[in-house]
């Protein structure tokens, strides 16, 4: 609670409450439109799979969702860093875990909260659920009960049972240690390791490190009472006893003398600079206490510039984050129907993650983390959490280990086919907003000008931007009006870190007026007209700030129509050379991540304009790390209608052909991407339908749709945004010489923040 200020707390509550409360819902995977569908789904048709399963229990994987279903189960006795909150209060966390399973590995997960602190009662409640799920993820159960619960359930159930608080941390830690040892020319068996904190994660770390080859006699485990040594009686249990050291050392300070490795799973401030200074040459320091590490990387580097450092935090390099493990470990285990997650599978996961860090980083990952050096070395020993390769690399390694160790039920297994399946299961663009956030966090923050700074949603978005450290917000408005609006949002909210600019009181009015007059003097504007615009029109003033270098990006639109806002800004900021102003939206769905353009500007584009929009949108896709497959959309497909309205679309394809064949640039952009048209949306997105047109040039489903006109583009994107469950981002403005985003008048604070994130990234590219 201390780490969450009032606005974040309120925003979090609103996020969980709005629309349908919570974060997960059940959706159907089969059609339920007709009476026949209903008869097949339930009575009498459902009897058929029931009878087949009764004959052969393995058929449950064939006819039900069990093969892709995980239960996230807790009793709430160790909720995050909040302690014993109880079963009901743990539910938001368990729902969040279920969301991560779906987002990162396409695993359906459901949360179950068991209202008991008695380990035996908990075990009895869970053990009978085996036929319902393909795996069990235990979460937020306090030690030492968590050890007993996991051990017993693993012995009673024939599906994977995995306590992520233990093993997830252990696996990512092991991956980092494998690479850190390699970089410092050490072997695992020779490492002298000190671990501070003797809870679930620490015990699991020791188990896995020993399995990897670390010498047990060279590990010293400490807790709040000091070294866990043989003969100690205070604060002991059988799990600590297992790793009690035969040593005369009694304190953490003594333990760190000449130690090679420190693994912290304890509390902030547990380690001092003096302790670190006495470690061995090239020390390996994993300070993973959350939210604040045992010692900060800055303090470590102050005394040991030869150290390799990892933490649990995303704002430092080498983040030990469980999300790199558990979704993909379960993915691999489920896909081969493993009966357990054994040590061999955990080792395989750790080694796969370690190996991935040594590989060249693909362009889409590098772009997402712009400004960060991602070459295997001291600052990059662990992959970044949003590396889309993780699902293929880790899940495959786990699946193979399950088969080789004899715990997999699936015997007919092709590694190559499995990798292809995993690659198509999740598209990298599904995590694009996270990529943007990481890119922003790796460079100096940009100044983002919010023209309509007196509006509640705009102020809320600016506050979120400040708190998330996405940028330095500048809001245009009158202080007294802003303060009134701020009180509506919540009391005791500070605007610290947000700059307020009142256009009428600015000391830059003369400079901005001079700039604007030079642009408009031959367009019917007198100097006094320009002075009035700068002083009274918030869009003009904000645009002048960006044009004159006093801001890096501009957001506006919630108080004016898109076209009115566009007309204001175009007076101040021109289109980029060889670019047209256009709008696009991104639809992020399970099977398709699609860019739709132009849904903002050109009402009825001619053939050349369509070709230009296609080329520019393909460039946008490339900048997002997407290989563009462009479809020029119509109601007809490849000439099956001779109506005149489709001719311009075919002509646009011919224009693209000519530029592609002659290797010429269209508006300064190479036509070196896949494209075709005219075609219907169904053909563009449906592989089976495209088979009817074997000449179609698209190698896969289109991921860029160029709409034939503004009406169809705007209507289709608004319908998708309103009625589908797909994630939807936009409209996003592209083509100005400076970063400008024009918002919908209905934009919420979260939607404004999303678009502002694009503005931040665009501003980074301006440098």
From Swiss-Prot:
The keyword Ribosomal protein does not apply. NADP(+) binds at residues 198-201, 290, 322. GO terms for biological process: malate metabolic process. Residues 431-767 are annotated as: Phosphate acetyltransferase. One of its GO terms (molecular function) is acyltransferase activity. It holds the Pfam family malic. InterPro entries: Aminoacid_DH-like_N_sf, Malate_Decarboxylase, Malic_enzyme_CS, Malic_N_dom, Malic_N_dom_sf, Malic_NAD-bd, Malic_NAD-bd_bact_type, ME_PTA. It comes from the Bacteria. A divalent metal cation binds at residues 139-140, 165. Gene3D superfamilies: 3.40.50.10950, Isocitrate/Isopropylmalate dehydrogenase-like, Malic enzyme, N-terminal domain, NAD(P)-binding Rossmann-like Domain. It is an enzyme of class 1 (oxidoreductase). Its cofactor is Mg(2+); Mn(2+). This is Probable NADP-dependent malic enzyme. The active site is at residues 42, 97. It catalyses: (S)-malate + NADP(+) = pyruvate + CO2 + NADPH; oxaloacetate + H(+) = pyruvate + CO2. In the N-terminal section; belongs to the malic enzymes family. PANTHER family: NADP-DEPENDENT MALIC ENZYME (PTHR43237:SF4). SUPFAM superfamilies: Aminoacid dehydrogenase-like, N-terminal domain, Isocitrate/Isopropylmalate dehydrogenase-like, NAD(P)-binding Rossmann-fold domains. Residues 1-430 are annotated as: Malic enzyme. Its EC number is 1.1.1.40. Keywords: Metal-binding, Multifunctional enzyme, NADP, Oxidoreductase. Divalent metal cations. Prefers magnesium or manganese. The keyword Oxidoreductase applies.
């Amino acid at each position: 609670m201390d780490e969450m200020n009032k606005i974040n707390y309120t925003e979090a509550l609103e996020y969980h409450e709005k629309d349908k409360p919570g974060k997960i819902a059940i959706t159907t995977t089969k059609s339920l439109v007709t009476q026949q569908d209903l008869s097949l789904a339930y009575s009498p048709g459902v009897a058929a799979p029931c009878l087949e399963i009764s004959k052969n229990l393995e058929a449950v994987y064939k006819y039900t969702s069990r093969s892709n279903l995980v239960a996230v189960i807790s009793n709430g006795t160790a909720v995050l860093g909040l302690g014993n909150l109880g079963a009901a209060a743990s539910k938001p966390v368990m729902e969040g875990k279920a969301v991560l399973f779906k987002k990162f590995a396409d695993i359906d997960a459901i949360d179950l909260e068991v209202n008991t602190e008695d380990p035996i009662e908990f075990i009895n409640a869970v053990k009978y659920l085996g036929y319902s799920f393909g795996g069990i993820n235990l979460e937020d159960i306090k030690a030492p009960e968590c050890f007993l619960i996991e051990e017993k359930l693993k012995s009673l159930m024939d599906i994977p049972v995995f306590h992520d608080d233990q093993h997830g941390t252990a696996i990512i830690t092991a991956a980092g240690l494998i690479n850190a040892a390699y970089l410092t020319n050490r072997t695992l068996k020779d490492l002298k390791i000190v671990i501070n904190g003797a809870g679930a994660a620490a015990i699991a770390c020791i188990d896995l490190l020993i399995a990897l080859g670390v010498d047990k006699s060279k590990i010293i485990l400490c807790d709040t009472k000091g070294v866990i040594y043989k003969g100690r009686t205070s604060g002991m249990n059988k799990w600590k006893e297992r790793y009690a050291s035969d040593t005369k050392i009694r304190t953490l300070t003594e333990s760190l003398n000449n130690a090679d490795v420190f693994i912290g799973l304890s509390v902030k401030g547990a380690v001092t600079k003096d302790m670190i200074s006495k470690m061995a040459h090239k020390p390996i320091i994993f300070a993973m206490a959350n939210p604040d590490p045992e010692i900060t990387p800055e303090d470590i580097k102050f005394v040991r510039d030869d150290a390799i450092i990892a933490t649990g935090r995303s704002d430092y390099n080498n983040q030990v984050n469980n999300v790199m493990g558990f979704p993909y470990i379960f993915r691999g285990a489920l896909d081969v129907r493993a009966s357990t997650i054994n040590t061999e599978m955990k080792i395989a996961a750790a080694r796969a993650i370690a190996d991935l860090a040594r590989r060249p980083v693909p362009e889409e990952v590098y772009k997402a983390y712009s400004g960060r050096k991602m070459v295997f070395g001291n600052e990059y020993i662990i992959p970044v959490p949003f590396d889309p390769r993780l699902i293929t690399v880790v899940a495959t390694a786990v699946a193979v280990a399950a088969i080789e160790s004899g715990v997999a039920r699936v015997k007919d297994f092709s590694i190559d086919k499995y990798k292809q399946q995993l690659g198509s299961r999740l598209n990298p663009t599904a995590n694009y907003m996270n990529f943007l956030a990481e890119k922003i966090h790796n460079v100096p923050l940009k100044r983002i000008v919010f023209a309509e700074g007196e509006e509640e949603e705009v102020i809320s978005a600016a506050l979120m931007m400040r708190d998330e450290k996405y940028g330095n917000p500048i809001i245009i408005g009158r202080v007294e009006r802003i303060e009134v609006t701020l009180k509506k949002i919540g009391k005791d909210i500070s605007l610290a870190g947000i700059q307020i600019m009142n256009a009428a009181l600015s000391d830059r009015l003369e400079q901005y007026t001079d700039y604007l007059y030079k642009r408009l003097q031959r367009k019917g504007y007198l100097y006094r007209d320009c002075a009035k615009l700068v002083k009274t029109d918030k869009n003009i003033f904000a645009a002048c700030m960006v044009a004159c270098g006093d801001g890096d990006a501009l957001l506006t639109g919630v108080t004016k129509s898109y076209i009115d806002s566009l007309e204001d800004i175009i007076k101040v900021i021109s289109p980029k050379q060889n670019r047209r102003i256009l709008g696009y939206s991104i639809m992020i769905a399970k099977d398709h991540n699609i860019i739709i353009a132009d849904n903002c500007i050109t009402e009825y584009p001619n053939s050349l304009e369509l070709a230009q929009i296609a080329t520019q949108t393909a460039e946008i896709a490339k900048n997002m790390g997407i290989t563009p497959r462009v479809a020029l959309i119509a109601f007809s497909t490849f000439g099956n209608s001779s109506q005149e309205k489709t001719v311009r679309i075919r002509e646009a394809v011919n224009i693209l052909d000519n530029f592609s064949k002659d290797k010429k640039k269209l508006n300064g952009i190479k036509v070196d991407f896949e494209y075709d048209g005219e075609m219907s949306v169904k053909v563009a997105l449906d592989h089976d339908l495209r088979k009817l047109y074997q000449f179609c040039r698209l190698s896969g489903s289109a991921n860029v749709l160029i709409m034939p006109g503004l009406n169809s583009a705007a209507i289709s994107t608004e319908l998708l945004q309103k009625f589908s469950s797909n994630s939807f981002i936009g409209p996003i403005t592209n083509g100005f010489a400076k970063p400008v985003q024009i918002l919908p008048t209905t934009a919420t604070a979260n939607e404004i923040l999303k678009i502002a994130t694009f503005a931040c990234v665009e501003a980074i590219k301006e440098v």
